[in-house]
Amino acid sequence: MASLLWRDTSKNIAAILEKLPADYAVDYDVPNNVEDGYITINKKNFTYHVVISGVRKYSPDVEAIVKKKSGLKSIITIEKVEKIEPLSFMEFRVGGKTLEAMGSFEVAERQVTEIKEKYGENLSEDVQKVLDDARAMGFTLPESVAEEIARRRTEWGEKAYKNILKRIGEEIGNELIDPYEAVGIIAAQSIGEPGTQMTMRTFHFAGVREMNVTLGLPRLIEIVDARRIPSTPSMTIYLRPEYETNDEVVMDVVKRLENTSISDVADIITDIGELTVTVRPDPRKTKDRLIEMEDIMNAISKIKGITVMEDSGQIIIKPQQESFKKLYLLQEQIKGLTIKGISGIKRAIARVEGKEHRWVIYTQGSNLKDVLEVDEVDPTRTYTNDIVEIANVLGIEAARNAILNEALRTLQEQGLNVDVRHLMLVADMMTFSGSVRAVGRTGISGRKSSVLARAAFEITTKHLLRAGIMGEVDKLAGVAENIIVGQPITLGTGAVDIIYKGYPKTKK
């Protein structure tokens, strides 16, 4: 939101406070989208916050407090003025640059977000002092680290405290990437080397024959390939706090989540002579899954072009167009017909975790959108390993975090330690375009702007022919294309030019 910034006198501020709501005339064209403002009286920081309810053109017949007597252009209606903790000019930006000096008037944007303001208020003065000291030294500390330092500051003493902050600053400086460093190849090396030690295996859920989860190298390949459907999609579903210890509610949710098709609870018999399909429900299976005959009838009634009859506890279905092909198609359609549950959730099991007897539901199959709509499910903790589905339901930032978490977890389960920043770089590259793209010829590598880089990866002839037809120009800005033509790459020392400046000749 745009804010109006201006420099004023204590006399004018006192006049505004006395006459609230006050009309204030200025020699500046104020935009109509301004809703608040900040006033400085010392040219160093803003000490007053102003609520503006309206902006209109100046008219001489309006009685208003004036900042200057000549060249008046706008009248601001000021509803409220409050004194605030001094705000630095550095918290405002004008035209993409940080505000450094206050002229007469400026329209600027405040950089502090609501979230930062909300959580920043909860910090103690000691923690805030540590954060400020760190910023003064040129680096930023996480709040958790600042809290630990503030807690032990008295124990260490002031001299040790300053030395520790100095050492932290030096360590952070050492960890920063060097200018023009080839971060991509280092990330590839750092992930690829441990990746060679990963096993090709699938994890099996103990005691549940149908449930498997792909881990190791196959899972890592799935992640970087951005597979639309993972080989073993699964969900971890948490219930709301009021339900997660209630056994009856948990079992009810499990049964409502599982996708129950007709083939799960009934035998399907095809009579070629009579051209009919008979559905014979199994009483034990229907009781276990809380299925009534009425539920099966309702599911079958959704099929068009059939005649349905119920006879002695079984359902007889006949296609209106009598043919063997129609009969076969009808049989296959009935097998996969959903009676109840959520589509895509093939299996669900509940497990007790932790000392507090809290239930967590694990599923084979995934359908994040529909699961989050179940009343008892906690949408803030429920998770799926289907990254593309996360992108479709929760957005690209959630998908970026999912790529990072899934890759990190896959490596850690194999006992491999990879710096998270390498994985963050991969996640950023896969999602920066706004959609999840694979690391391969169909994704990042196949969509590079360089013709030679695309051709060097895969399908060389196609890329070169298409580039020739379209008249593409390669500016040789990347790594692969410069290596191909035998030029130094524009990274590291190849990114800068060295100019020799000799010493001037001295007169003898």
Curated annotation (Swiss-Prot):
UniProt GO BP: DNA-templated transcription
Region (Unknown): 1-123
CDD domains, per database record: RNAP_A
Keywords, sorted A to Z: Cytoplasm, DNA-binding, DNA-directed RNA polymerase, Nucleotidyltransferase, Transcription, Transferase
Coiled coil (residue ranges): none
One of the record's GO molecular function terms: DNA-directed RNA polymerase activity
GO cellular component, one term: cytoplasm
Catalytic reaction equation(s): RNA(n) + a ribonucleoside 5'-triphosphate = RNA(n+1) + diphosphate
InterPro entries, per database record: DNA-dir_RpoC_beta_prime, RNA_pol_Rpb1_5, RPO1C
Subcellular location: Cytoplasm
EC numbers for this chain: 2.7.7.6
Top-rank EC class of the record's enzyme: transferase
This protein's record includes keyword Transferase: yes
Ranges for region DNA-directed RNA polymerase subunit Rpo1C: 124-508
Family the UniProt entry places it in: Belongs to the RNA polymerase beta' chain family.
Function: DNA-dependent RNA polymerase (RNAP) catalyzes the transcription of DNA into RNA using the four ribonucleoside triphosphates as substrates. Forms part of the jaw domain.
PANTHER family: DNA-DIRECTED RNA POLYMERASE, DNA-DIRECTED RNA POLYMERASE III SUBUNIT RPC1
Subunit (UniProt): Part of the RNA polymerase complex.
Protein name as it appears in the record: DNA-directed RNA polymerase subunit Rpo1C
Species assigned in the record: Thermoplasma acidophilum (strain ATCC 25905 / DSM 1728 / JCM 9062 / NBRC 15155 / AMRC-C165)
